[in-house]
Amino acid sequence: MCGIFGYCNFLIEKTRGEIIDTLIEGLQALEYKEYDSSGISIQGDELKSLNIYKQTGKISSLKEEIDLYNLNKNLPFISHCGITHTRRATHGGLRRANCHPHNSDPSNEFVVVHNGVITNFANLKALLVAKGYVFKSDTDTECIPKLYKHIYDTSIELGYNLDFHVLTNLVLKELEGSYGLLCTSSHFPDEVVAARKGSPLVIGVKGKTDMDVNFVEVEYLDQEEDYLKLNTQTKSSGNVLAAAPVKYNTCLRKSPPPSFTIPEKLYNFYIQSWLIHRNASRERLAATHGILFVIRLCITSAVCE
């Protein structure tokens, strides 16, 4: 069992030291006796750069690893997104290369932390290796950031300018198995994408002023009505991986987007498992076709963390 944690501050100045401390505290809250490594990704000194630090052993070993780099912990960030991970070795043994976060390439264009199992990772890895990607680990997770980069680069070549949310949907469409994941990217600074399939996620928002929050509720239908099919097509071959289009019977209905105001205190948003396992028929749908749930929290005219 792995643990993932992310922290974002928007329009609230925090020093790098404060950000690292918050991320480490989040990791410590996820500590349990069987984890064997941990890692962290934060913004670098240069704009749109991401740094990764990871180490086997306890979280104290990760803190020692970070200290070796003599980072400027007084460097301020008006906005910043950082992600962290504790790992128990499953795919791949206990070695530093297998620790999370995993990256898409040496420049860390896409960085991912992940809890779950990608069951088709061998096929994805073979495809990506054929495209020239070099894998450093034995994990199933590493295929995710490299898939992000492959789809992103391909979309640019095809003339598409995808936002982070649309790009994530294209990536998730290719993944089989279960996941709770966080992804950051140098192409989308000050943004983080959270997605889950079978693994609950919790989002907490804290601000000094009231905030308007909008979100979209989704319900998976047994019949095809007022739905958005999950196999979104592109103008080229229908799939940026040039594979045959996949047909899903799973249907998605969007309810009217509710909105509400968050008072001046911490609120937690629980993405519960009941959405997937409400009854046996939906359980079969989840097992057969998979259910995607991408979290997108839109905060209007607010400063928050």
Swiss-Prot record:
Species in which this protein is naturally found: Saccharomyces cerevisiae (strain Lalvin EC1118 / Prise de mousse)
Pathway the protein contributes to: Nucleotide-sugar biosynthesis; UDP-N-acetyl-alpha-D-glucosamine biosynthesis; alpha-D-glucosamine 6-phosphate from D-fructose 6-phosphate: step 1/1
Gene3D superfamilies in UniProt: Glutamine Phosphoribosylpyrophosphate, subunit 1, domain 1
GO molecular function: glutamine-fructose-6-phosphate transaminase (isomerizing) activity
GO-annotated biological processes: fructose 6-phosphate metabolic process; protein N-linked glycosylation; UDP-N-acetylglucosamine biosynthetic process
Pfam families: GATase_6
Superkingdom: Eukaryota
Main EC class the enzyme belongs to: transferase
Protein name: Putative glutamine--fructose-6-phosphate aminotransferase [isomerizing]
E.C. no: 2.6.1.16
Active-site annotation: C2
